[in-house]
Amino acid sequence: LLGDDKILGIFGVYAFFITSGFLVTQSAQFGSVGGFLWRRALRIYPALVVCILLSVYVLGPLFSPLGIRRYLRWSNPLETTVLSVLNPSYGMKLPNVQFYDPAISWLATFTNGSLWSISQEIFCYLILAALMAIGLLRAPFMALALAVGVTWQLFFEHPWPDTQLITDFTFIAPYFFCGSLLWFVMEKWQPNLVLASIFAALGVLCLVFLPAYSYGPMLFAYPLVYIAISPSIQLPTLDRLGDVSYGTYLYGWPVEQVVNHALGQYSTWWTVFGLSLPITLLLGWLSWHLLEKHALRLKRISFLQRQPVSP
């Protein structure tokens, strides 16, 4: 958190949606629509439900001005839990929970601001499933979806970042569609270093001269995918550590809020980051090894019919 209404993590959200669009589109090429949705549900919901339960029943009572008993009695934790599972955005702010003085920052009452993106991610999955069902999960349609999303930003007043910071699907969905389109592109053409360098240079120029443009960072999508899949780049594997990415994403914000509370007047973005990172990675590791990897084994009972989708 940088303060002054700037959230550094938004760049991580961009990368998250680009990567997700790429990988989920790859996953959608085989199997039935039901199988696709089942695999997505297994990836999203087990860790999400546990995170919400910990937020509502641990962080909520500890950081409510009402105290533990009155919080549990007056804040309807069960209703909050159910609504947050059905719509993760609802769990961003818990009733009667405050981590520090709101006069310091407008983020003081946000228990887990990252959950807004989970709702949008689920919506993107449903769109992909619908396209699978009607046979339109193809490159031209994803290009059209991307073009419409970016054009909307150019010609219509967009709420980001002045009015609605974290609730507009039309803001983030184009990043997912961009990742999806890149999967079709990479299926037909090998990743190209020159092209990746050009896009990276354009991305830097856009950030420097058009910093307010919401889709400038999208220019880094091709370089990001190039680094991830190019055979000439050998990235270190994290097999021993496990896939801690999702758990780290879920717990990063709550941990930062707790650290902000603990530091008080000594809270700066670099101290918050430095203290939060190892704690968040530990929680991500626990989430993967105790819950997520076991839940993913259930995908074996899913719908295994091979139904390739034409590009």
Tell me the role of every PLM-derived stretch.
Residues 1-7, 11, 45-122, 221, ...:
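Membrane-interface helix-loop-helix regions
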Residues 10-14, 27-87, 246-250, 256, ...:
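Transmembrane alpha-helical segments and their boundary/interface "anchor" motifs
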Residues 25-29, 55-59, 132, 136, ...:
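Membrane-water interface at transmembrane helix exits
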Residues 43-45, 152-153, 176-183, 221-231, ...:
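Alpha-helical transmembrane segments and their membrane-interface exit regions
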Residues 78-218, 251, 257-279:
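Aromatic-enriched alpha-helical transmembrane segments of multi-pass intramembrane proteins
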Residues 301-311:
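Short, intrinsically disordered terminal tails adjacent to the first/last structured region
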